[in-house]
Design a protein with these regions (language model features):
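Charged, alpha-helix-enriched surfaces in structured cytosolic catalytic cores
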Residues: 2-5, 22, 63, 95-99
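Short, surface-exposed helix-loop/turn micro-motifs enriched in polar/charged residues
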Residues: 2, 23, 39-42, 92
């Protein structure tokens, strides 16, 4: 199982998409065990779109939510970036993909700085 980290905006996006607390917990369990699940989104720096069925909609994955995750496998957690229902959005725009690329670069850079600081005996972690 991998560590999962939610970005600050993930919970509010999950509520808008209709996910319950149980849905979120189910998804976290799923993605912790399967961090490479979903299809990679070109131009995002490695984000993946994971289709996930939510409780009570009886439509399976196709009627569920689309969660955007980021996982590099380089000792970083799996990041839950955002989530949306199919009725909210089908695909990401070019501008959204570009924003995700900047975000994923910042995540990797920040973690690299933290590791270097820890290796040097610093306090930043």
């Amino acid at each position: 199982m991998h560590t999962v980290s939610e970005l600050r905006t993930f919970r509010s996006a999950a509520a808008v998409a209709g996910m319950s607390q149980e849905d979120i917990e189910d998804f976290v369990d799923h993605i912790a065990a399967n961090p490479d699940d979903g299809e990679e989104i070109v131009g995002t720096g490695g984000c993946r779109k994971v289709r996930f069925a939510i409780r009570g909609n009886n439509k399976g994955k196709s009627g569920g939510v689309r969660t955007i995750t980021f996982y590099t496998g380089n000792d970083l957690p799996v990041f839950l970036i955002t989530v949306f229902s199919k009725s909210q959005k089908v695909n990401l725009t070019k501008a959204e993909r570009n924003s995700l690329k900047k975000l994923t670069t910042a995540i990797v850079d920040e973690y690299a700085m933290r590791v270097q600081a820890l290796a040097a005996g610093g306090e930043r972690a």
